[in-house]
Amino acid sequence: MTTPVLQTLHRIYPRAVIDMVVDKRSRDLFVHCPYRGELFEKDKQAFMRGFPRLVFRLARKRYRLAVDLRTDGLLCLIRAGKKLGKWNGDASATHAVEKHLSVVRTLAGDKSVYHCCLWPGDEDLSFAGRMLEQVKSKKTLCIAPGANAAKKIWSWKSFRELINRIDRDFDSVVLLGSRRDRPIAEEITAGINLQALNLCGETSLLQAAAILAHASLFIGNDSGLGHMAAAAGAPTCTLFGPGQPEKYRPWGDAAVWLTGRNRQVNDISVDDVIRHLELNRLLA
């Protein structure tokens, strides 16, 4: 949810390259960003060793501007002509994207609201083309059945029923996620009529992004894939349980969401989802 900030900075400083502090998993998402500079990896698993190494590398450079949207102390250790942190933002902003953008708007009063974006490379686009050639679909439904916690995962039985009830609107369904999501995806595909492509555990993040760019609709739990789908331009419907959609829902004009009663994702019924999709004109 930080890419709108990158786009704002690029508009203000079109000739600048932007160094970024990233974690191991998100690093690949920025490799093909056309205005990126150096990527500094933050090792969350080895904090005591990794943080001093990160600080040492950053301290060797001097910046015109340093922006920190997440931590409280890293800016103190970076040499920069100007520094902006969370305290420069609008405390009343609700969504994380709006809060992040409010930090850098102090630079030029820019009121533009950029969408999140992704930069898949040529190899990622070719991979997506090869995979989707298997289903030869004009209208693809993408499903992400997993999440990073069991309490965020909608029942595979509900996903299966939902797909069967809306399958007239699609030619195929592609399932995306990690390798641990694959058994759930197999349960779903075992009982559906649509031609299915189970790619759980078979893609990198950018390969998944390239596939999501072809989706006619994305439906998934509260996970990173929902944010990627919205950034790729797909209409999205995210199912929330204990999360905070007002702060962390996918960002985009065609991104909708539902929250289960009492913050329980499995209190969302299939009927609830279909009504919500129809209300938001995401079904034909």
What are these regions (language model features)?
Residues 1-284:
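Catalytic machinery of carbohydrate-active enzymes
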